[in-house]
Curated annotation (Swiss-Prot):
Keywords carried by this UniProt record: Cytoplasm, Hydrolase, Metal-binding, Metalloprotease, Nucleus, Protease, Zinc
GO molecular function list: aminopeptidase activity; epoxide hydrolase activity; metallopeptidase activity; zinc ion binding
Protein residues bound to substrate: Q169, C170, Q171, P295, Y296, G297, G298, M299, E300
Highest rank taxon of the organism: Eukaryota
Catalysed reactions listed for this entry: an epoxide + H2O = an ethanediol
Co-factor binding comment: Binds 1 zinc ion per subunit.
Main localization category: cytoplasm
NCBIfam families associated with the record: leuko_A4_hydro
GO cellular component: cytosol; fungal-type vacuole lumen; multivesicular body; nucleus; NVT complex
PROSITE patterns associated with the record: ZINC_PROTEASE (PS00142)
Name of this protein: Leucine aminopeptidase 2
């Protein structure tokens, strides 16, 4: 799926666009049939707004949380600079109740267009004649029960069972269901956020003043961010420090567990990232641990990462997700893809930085070990997606979301932009040499800071940076850019350091060749960390189908393995998920209801979607019954995706 800053005097910077392309850019030379003949980044096909004509200088959101009717009600106000004198302002909306619109303090005419099944309804606001190049537009509205970004939980659905809870998930195009918006990563704005609530609230900004007594919670986001990074959550929340500039928020009953999980590493991650890129610009980096139905591992909401409770395993083995979300403070939040077609610029860079952070703190062998796990995830995604022509097209690095009136970015979501993107950046580092590549990393993020860009601008920036280095330029020119960016499937596999994986491979090979479990014991994995357990189980799965091998012929062996290593009882959900995957391959029927029960407790799509697909492959009736029984537990995004998976 899926961080922050603190900076003053940044409003004027939010108006700076990415530099215009030259008449013949490097990208146009290398990709003559791909690069659009226009200046600036490509238009985002996933928005109905006419954002090209407007630049927000600030956005003010004032909302009241209606806990009884489960909705947000209030207003959003845009301070805009106008270009080219448009007659109308068009914003994205989805399932919103629009009550009134004011332009420069006066009521304005507006209309809501016919609903597009993916992109929602355009809100068209008539602008007064001769309104000038500065506008203030205020829209009074409320959300509705059909809102796709919000999930509301009853007290019984929370850990503490004391108060209701709600949270938002706006990426990719769900901000339009929370407020009328330029719902595109191409548009950024600073934010003032004022929330009235009977329960504590956190938001994607720095807390200015908050009071449980008055029920008023005020936040300021001083760095311009796109709408998909707007975030709110509320409920029975408390906080504890996990570093000199970081706090963790959770329900009080889980607070000490969450504090323990993150306090050892958070500041180390920040320091390492600052050394790789440049100083952290967001002032505070906090983490909110959400209820189990949160659909992602983490979401990089500025100033407060939203995190799945599956990270809190008690062994501090899953905190690399925090390194990932923190890395978004530079890649994604500070420098942003202009559209979801270029999503790899967000996630590929973030995975690359995440693993650089891991390498800086734990050594290059651990960095490569993490990359091996990522490569396995990429292979799995490409194999699954290659069964369908549309899905296969989403295994390209740069995807096309324009066909057939527009595709849903959520449908294109997979590990591909993460892992194929980071693999490409690792390839560049290897080809150029880390000593030469590191200065480019810093330059790239400084050059595009506060801006949104496309892949072609990335290419231009890369070539421009090495313009006086013939050796590097020759290597860049030798790359098959068409294949790299637009060919579906797997890229060339990098040469990884397998030192930390070799023990896992060896143990997996022993199990493959074994006729019974008599030679195995829990001592086999006594020295393994959770990541090594994951690689061991992945390696077992990869034997399936090779040279006619099938784990279904070794059902009893796999069942015994689960018992010997207590895999279903692991405290780490990554291990549990991979265990059920191999158990399904071996058709261990006793594990089917256990998997169904587990799926009722986790909402993270990384586990939920593969889990349901696996269960559906062996027991469709149980899979569908389990989903029907638990579908209201899942976030709307997750619920929709699993429903499609089971069709």
């Amino acid at each position: 799926m899926f961080s922050l800053r603190a900076l003053s005097g940044v409003v004027t910077r939010s108006l700076v666009r990415a530099p215009h392309r030259r008449t013949m850019s490097h990208a146009a030379r290398l990709l003559p049939h791909r690069v659009p003949q226009k200046k600036g980044p490509e238009r985002d096909p996933s928005t109905l707004s006419n954002y090209e004509h407007f630049k927000p200088t600030n956005t003010t959101v004032c909302l009241k949380v209606d806990w009884t009717d489960q909705k947000l009600a209030g207003s959003v106000t845009y301070d805009l600079t106008v270009e080219n004198s448009p007659k109308n302002l068009v914003l994205d909306t989805s399932y919103l109740d629009i009550q009134e619109v004011q332009v420069n303090g006066h009521k304005a005419d507006f209309s809501i267009g016919e609903r597009h099944n993916i992109f929602g309804s355009p809100l068209t606001i008539t602008l007064p004649p001769n309104s000038g190049d500065k506008l203030q537009v205020k829209i009074a509205y409320s959300t509705t029960p059909s809102c796709t970004a919000l999930q509301w939980l009853t007290p019984e659905q929370t850990a503490g069972k004391k108060a209701p809870y709600f949270f938002s998930q706006c990426q990719a195009i769900h901000a339009r269901s929370v407020m009328p918006a330029f719902d595109t990563p191409s548009v950024k704005s600073t934010f003032d956020i004022e929330i009235e609530s009977d329960h504590p609230v956190v938001a994607s900004g720095l807390p200015i003043k908050s009071s449980n007594d008055t029920g008023k919670f005020v936040f300021r986001q001083k760095v311009p961010i796109p709408a998909y990074l707007f975030a709110l959550a509320g409920g029975d929340l408390d906080s504890a420090p996990i570093g000199p500039r970081s706090d963790v928020y959770s329900e009080p009953c889980d607070l000490h567990k969450c504090q323990y999980e993150f306090e050892a590493d958070t500041e180390k991650f920040i320091n390492a990232a600052e050394n790789i890129v440049f100083p952290y610009e967001w002032e505070k980096y906090d983490v909110l641990v959400l209820p189990p139905s949160f659909p992602y591992g983490g979401m990089e909401n500025p100033n407060i990462t939203f995190a799945t409770p599956t990270l809190v395993s008690g062994d501090r083995q899953n905190v690399d997700v925090i390194a990932h979300e923190l890395a978004h403070s530079w890649s994604g939040n500070l420098v942003t893809n202009c559209s979801w077609e270029h999503f790899w610029l967000n996630e590929g860079w973030t995975v690359y930085l995440e693993r650089r952070i891991v390498g800086a703190l734990e050594g290059e062998q651990q960095r490569h070990f993490s990359a091996i796990i990522g490569w396995n995830a990429l292979e799995e995604s490409v194999k699954l997606m290659s069964r369908d022509p549309v899905q296969e097209s989403y295994t390209q690095l740069v995807v096309d979301l324009k066909p057939n009136g527009g595709a849903d970015p959520d449908d294109a979501f997979s590990s591909v932009p993460y892992e194929k993107g980071s693999t490409f950046l690792f390839f560049l580092e290897t080809e150029i040499g880390q000593a030469k590549f590191d200065p480019f990393v810093k330059h790239y993020f400084k050059h595009f800071r506060y801006k949104s860009l496309d892949t072609y601008q990335f290419i231009d920036c890369l070539f421009d940076f090495y313009a006086n280095d013939k050796e590097v330029t020759d290597k860049l020119n030798a790359i098959d850019w068409e294949k790299t960016l637009f060919a579906p499937g797997l890229p060339n596999k990098p040469k990884f350091d397998t030192t930390l994986a070799d023990e896992c491979y060896s143990l997996a090979s022993r199990w493959k060749d074994a006729s019974d479990a008599s030679a195995f014991s829990a001592k086999d994995i006594a020295s393994f960390n959770s990541s090594q357990m994951v690689v061991f189980l992945i390696t077992l799965s990869e034997y399936e189908g090779k040279d006619g091998f099938s784990w279904a012929n070794k059902k009893e062996l796999i069942s015994n393995m689960g018992d010997i290593y207590s895999l279903a009882n692991s405290s780490n959900p990554e291990v549990i998920a991979k265990w059920y995957s191999i158990a399904i391959l071996a058709k261990v029927e006793s594990e089917y209801p256990k998997l169904a029960d587990w799926l009722a407790t986790v909402g993270r799509m990384k586990f939920v979607r593969p889990g349901y697909r696996a269960l559906n492959s062996v027991d469709p009736k149980l899979a569908k019954e389990t989903f029907e029984k638990n579908k209201d537990f899942y976030h709307p995004i997750c619920r929709d995706m699993v429903s499609k998976d089971l069709q």
